[in-house]
Amino acid sequence: MKVKKSTRSKVSTACVNCRKRKIKCTGKYPCTNCISYDCTCVFLKKHLPQKEDSSQSLPTTAVAPPSSHANVEASADVQHLDTAIKLDNQYYFKLMNDLIQTPVSPSATHAPDTSNNPTNDNNILFKDDSKYQNQLVTYQNILTNLYALPPCDDTQLLIDKTKSQLNNLINSWNPEINYPKLSSFSPRPQRSIETYLLTNKYRNKIHMTRFSFWTDQMVKSQSPDSFLATTPLVDEVFGLFSPIQAFSLRGIGYLIKKNIENTGSSMLIDTKETIYLILRLFDLCYEHLIQGCISISNPLENYLQKIKQTPTTTASASLPTSPAPLSNDLVISVIHQLPQPFIQSITGFTTTQLIENLHDSFSMFRIVTQMYAQHRKRFAEFLNQAFSLPHQEKSVLFSSFCSSEYLLSTLCYAYYNVTLYHMLDINTLDYLEILVSLLEIQNEIDERFGFEKMLEVAVTCSTKMGLSRWEYYVGIDENTAERRRKIWWKIYSLEKRFLTDLGDLSLINEHQMNCLLPKDFRDMGFINHKEFLTKIGTSSLSPSSPKLKNLSLSRLIEYGELAIAQIVGDFFSETLYNEKFTSLEVSVKPTIIRQKLLEKVFEDIESFRLKLAKIKLHTSRVFQVAHCKYPEYPKNDLIEAAKFVSYHKNTWFSILGAVNNLIARLSEDPEVITEQSMKYANEMFQEWREINQFLIQVDTDFIVWACLDFYELIFFVMASKFYVEDPHITLEDVINTLKVFKRITNIISFFNNNLDEKDYDCQTFREFSRSSSLVAISIRIIFLKYCYAEQIDRAEFIERLKEVEPGLSDLLREFFDTRSFIYRYMLKSVEKSGFHLIIRKMLESDYKFLYRDKLATGNIPDQGNSSQISQLYDSTAPSYNNASASAANSPLKLSSLLNSGEESYTQDASENVPCNLRHQDRSLQQTKRQHSAPSQISANENNIYNLGTLEEFVSSGDLTDLYHTLWNDNTSYPFL
């Protein structure tokens, strides 16, 4: 039957494929273009054509059945949720599933183009599945014919039966590896077997994360064409499901790619500065991790080296069996640095008491951890009132708090190390309670490296002690049992908060955990973890219930935190890391199967949203307190309530950011998936506005500071969405954002006026500076997008704001000034010595092994200079600064990052060279670098990049060169 031609000259609707190809669509289902191209014809809900003839039979493609949502009702528990999203998701998937389309199904009327058919690829290591395809086509044709019949009960029964058979086929369709072919297969040494196993006949591009993807060219290309082409697709730091993948190297590459499109813009300088700042912050975060590693591995020596003190004798102060003995002199040297009587006044411990306990390492670990916890509590109290204290008193106290914080953390790390290897002693409740207390502090100051290492120990010890299993509680007294439960669930809660931020694989197996929940949960009708997950979504418990109403605010917050932790753990286990969605076989399955899985992912998101909303209902009293002011509630209650509200919001943003990586992996058509994800993005946009309003109205600037750790992730996720999805930013959004950051600037000014240079290593200062820098860069990105959207430059932007909010125009000007106090922390250490990326070491390490392997196999291109390889491998080049003044006169094309031999960016390299030799040596080094750089794999010399200083990059840096050097075309439009 011929397809009826449209009599209209224009159509008001178009299918997804016609819109993408920018060709005229007939507006009918299926359109003639999709029949010709042999592809799935999909109309999004808002583009669906009006049905003209329900009895018309269409060739080779199933007719869309009448859509009915009579059975889709929003339950009473989710009336306050955006049910429109859920309904539209169901409509979309109902449309896709009822059509039973597959991109590999042969058309009865049109021969498919096999010129680029991946089916012919000899690299496919799976068995042929034509049998399943033929069965699928058979069911397609049956359903097509059934839908063309007039509706009746018998027809519907046949349709249901056929669908059931089709579902059974889909569920049993599992790709099988062709083991004989695999055994005889000889992959190129540059690519792993896993890389080749992704080769399939259904698609030639598979996303691992939002910003990294596999293509069939990876197994066909002889050589990589950029630095990232030589590295794993999944970044070890950001992993599979990090909500901030946009901050990874591939994410930054996408940002640069977007800016290359705006090279003719009047905002070019601003965009180049922004890229530089992002790379600098990337560098700074790696340095933060490195410093954390140094602090915990050699705490005493590291501290004493910083203050230029060297102990003379070494007498053991630890247990005899310790593999890492402490030194009396080292410990005493650090203890004597504690500011007394200040420490005694806030912790209750004197220097004499500490020295008297040196013989007992476990006792010292408990004491210094108690001191550290008490110090954090008093420090928070001081900061909450610091803005009302006289300057002199404020400055002295602040200095004492900062210096003693670093000292106490040093002692805690030292005694953690020395007690770690006494397995019989650490497998006790006493030790775990100490460790949990230290973990809470680590989490508060965001010491990621130390937190992760201690968390692994805590999880391992508590699991070995049976804290997660009910069987180990039989026969013990209830007080001890509840103490064990409290420790376990605190460790569990901390671990899930860590997952929420990073998207990592959990250390805890959710399916092997069956101990009882704490008493407050049991009183509410939740006996254990499994029952809580089953009941929480439909719980009838109201905020006015005595079981919730009689809880103190702190206990209600503890309930909310553990409740959130449990649904996060379940989502990670059952969705993000579920083999059903993430196995290698799933990646090579046909479109229709992945669409089914994608439907389940959206159902899981909705289930998570329902549970999170129910937790918000249960803890509504906390939300009420957070929106109040002192003196209606104590200041500490206001702070803790605000932190919980921020954590609740942060969780939703993190989950959506994480699951977008999974959506990217399963998706077939970016436009269709983006249409679905945009619904969540719009909701996030509105919630971001609400969070801004919340932070504007909180009682003190310190509350904003306390919420900053949660707020930074929310803001960065939003900034990445602004860059990808271009939501409409209003001037009101700009104003509210500036009002929030104005409160942050008060804290920055406080540090600038009261912090001594010797206290720059204070964890509180470093963490605040890192968080505020990330927020500042996110805001700058959003402001740039506003300028692009409005087609104005920074001067017009400032003038526009000045007309409505003159008091904020100066702050907006600061955001566009890289010499501003806003960016001082990021750029201070590179004012003299130039820009030094930590990724230099990453590049160096990767290329070392790369060229060593090539040398072993004899695959090094003959360049007539073997010393080039040895210099790269040994990394013995002298360390000088290469930021010469002449560099600004020509584009920074030839990269020299790897062999530049630059000093750490925290040190001015010129200090190591006599003044009269500096210029000469710099020129010599520049010449050496240009001659000694080895030939890259792609036979070009642009695979390694040195940005130079900010001024050099802005005046002479080439965005296109930078992009092609590190990324080339290894970025694409992500699914956000």
UniProtKB/Swiss-Prot annotation:
The keyword rRNA-binding does not apply. This is Transcription factor PDR3. The keyword Zinc applies. PDR1 and PDR3 jointly control the transcription level of both SNQ2 and PDR5. Residues 15-41 bind DNA. The gene is PDR3. GO terms for biological process: cellular response to xenobiotic stimulus; DNA-templated transcription; positive regulation of cellular response to drug; positive regulation of transcription by RNA polymerase II. It comes from Saccharomyces cerevisiae (strain ATCC 204508 / S288c) (Baker's yeast). GO terms for cellular component: cytoplasm; nucleus.
